[in-house]
């Protein structure tokens, strides 16, 4: 479903299948010193979804209405405990998947 995967990143082996009929919520922990790539894919494109990254206190750190194929890189200065919340905005979505990958952050000179 996610053609090309996450080149250059180590893929999280857990499968994150998105429920196309309701919100999907995933607990995540992100560590300092890494770059994380999050990618959303659907079988039918373009499909619209809302992506939210929320910290453990419920504060929204990032939100965006997106289309399938979206990816974004994140880096964290401190240990991040939170949730990824995916809201389907398109009733035509049949199958959707979330990929999370990581790689060691390059050291700055």
Q: What is each of the regions a protein language model found here?
A:
Residues 16-97, 104-109:
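Acidic, Ser/Thr/Pro-rich low-complexity intrinsically disordered segments
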Residues 1-22:
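Transition segment at domain starts
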